[in-house]
UniProtKB/Swiss-Prot annotation:
GO terms for molecular function: magnesium ion binding; phosphopyruvate hydratase activity. This is Enolase. Its main location: cytoplasm. It catalyses: (2R)-2-phosphoglycerate = phosphoenolpyruvate + H2O. Belongs to the enolase family. Mg(2+) binds at D242, E288, D315. It comes from Bacillus cereus (strain ZK / E33L). Coiled coil: none annotated. It is an enzyme of class 4 (lyase). It is found in: Cytoplasm; Secreted; Cell surface. It comes from the Bacteria.
Length: 431
């Protein structure tokens, strides 16, 4: 047993230059843990509350000193004295202290920072790497990376509607080789874009953000890059999309406006038709948030049409919330959940969501946020839970590469027992 003797939070910056919360946990044994909380750009309306100060004289109102003070003045006195290995007890105590259904009193960014820092301190105390401490002896599966190499939507200043176009190197024999494949396609894409006279600046998540003529054109240039790198689309490398359709859903009309396509007023059924058409023309294996987060009928239709052959991921739809996920499972909506630790606010609840998904035959994709830091906790979570997939950006920007590098270290440490499933991590669809 090692008792927590101090908890301290400070305001630091994320990859977009916005403030976020860093937390440190100290124990009587000398064990120490530190964690930094990520932040999203496109957020689901049902997510746990990210507490911002709203003081326009500091960081344009995006300061997090209220959340920092909540850690130092409210949470710290509550959990000092706890055994640092009592993760569930500590998380439960913070949830009860907050007392709201969405962590709106203390802020999910305050609570999550403590939750993750506690886990790091506990791992330090028992002398284990974080993935092994959290996952036990069976934590050995390296995740298939979903690499966001073209950014659009709210992640970039361009005219592409869909937020992310990803490559998935499912044909690699190891995680290390999947990273090599992804990097080679990334560099090939830069050359393709350059040759077309297109911008090769990168967006929030390290992918390119060119002004392409349509969402279809984004898929076409990626196919060209895959082939230029010496791989076969639909064999070595598949495609994925995070549509983030809530960002272009018109709440007043109840329709979808695809400005990049020059098409407005699309119904849910017409959006599903569009996805089906794209999946026939391109080797798309995963679609995230294809319909608005509240368009459950649309999601049901999408699942009926594509759910047996395409991974349909609920992000804004489920917001890493077991109640939302349970409802989706009951109604047969989607077949996968995106796992974002700051959507729900504690590690305990995050692990519960992953377990619920797996029991129902859904896949779970551990994910970063667009506002990231050098913190690589999600890499360890992906291995600890044998989640099978991770979405943590492109092959540029240190805030993204930090997670890939941590996974490379873990694979190296695991040695011969490391598992990389590639295409088999999409176990609930036919390919």
């Amino acid at each position: 047993m090692s008792t927590i003797i101090d908890v301290y939070a400070r305001e630091v910056l994320d990859s977009r230059g916005n403030p976020t919360v860093e937390v440190e946990v100290y124990t009587e044994s000398g064990a120490f843990g530190r964690a930094i909380v990520p932040s999203g750009a496109s957020t689901g309306e049902h997510e746990a509350v990210e507490l911002r100060d709203g003081d326009k004289s500091r960081y344009l109102g995006k300061g997090v000193m209220n959340a920092v003070n909540n850690v130092n003045e409210a949470i710290a006195p509550e959990i000092v004295g706890f055994d640092v290995t009592d993760q569930a007890g500590i998380d439960r105590a913070m949830i009860e202290l907050d007392g709201t259904p969405n962590k709106g009193k203390l802020g999910a960014n305050a609570i999550l920072g403590v939750s993750m820092a506690v886990a790091h301190a506990a791992a330090d105390f028992v002398g284990l790497p974080l993935y092994r401490y959290l996952g036990g002896f069976n934590a050995k599966q390296l995740p298939t990376p979903m690499m966001n190499i073209i950014n659009g939507g709210s992640h970039a200043d361009n005219n592409v509607d869909f937020q992310e176009f990803m490559i998935l190197p499912v044909g690699a024999p190891t995680f290390k080789e999947s990273i090599r494949m992804g990097a080679e396609v990334f560099h090939a894409l830069k050359a393709v874009l350059h040759d077309k006279g297109l911008n090769t600046a990168v967006g929030d998540e390290g992918g390119f953000a060119p002004n392409l003529g349509s969402n279809r054109e984004a898929l076409e240039v990626i196919i060209e890059a895959i082939e230029k790198a010496g791989y076969k689309a639909g064999e070595n490398v598949f495609l994925g999309m995070d549509v983030a359709s809530s960002e272009f859903y018109n709440k007043e009309t109840g329709k979808y406006d695809l400005a990049g396509e020059g098409r407005t007023g699309l119904t849910s059924a017409e959006m599903v038709d569009f996805y089906e058409e794209l999946c026939k023309d391109f080797p798309i294996i995963s679609i995230e948030d294809g319909l608005d987060e509240n368009d459950w009928d649309g999601h049901k239709l999408l699942t009926e049409r594509l759910g047996d052959k395409v991974q349909l991921v609920g992000d804004d739809l489920f917001v890493t919330n077991t109640q939302k996920l349970a409802e989706g499972i009951e109604k047969g909506i989607s077949n996968s959940i995106l796992i974002k630790v700051n959507q729900i606010g504690t590690l305990t609840e995050t692990f519960e969501a992953i377990e619920m998904a797996k029991r129902a035959g859904y896949t779970a994709v551990v994910s970063h946020r667009s506002g990231e830091t050098e913190d690589a906790t999600i890499a360890d979570i992906a291995v600890a839970t044998n989640a099978g997939q991770i979405k943590t950006g492109s092959m540029s920007r240190t805030d993204r590469i930090a997670k890939y590098n941590q996974l490379l270290r873990i694979e190296d440490e695991l040695g011969e027992i490391a598992v990389y499933d590639g295409i088999k991590s999409f176990y609930n669809i036919k390919r």
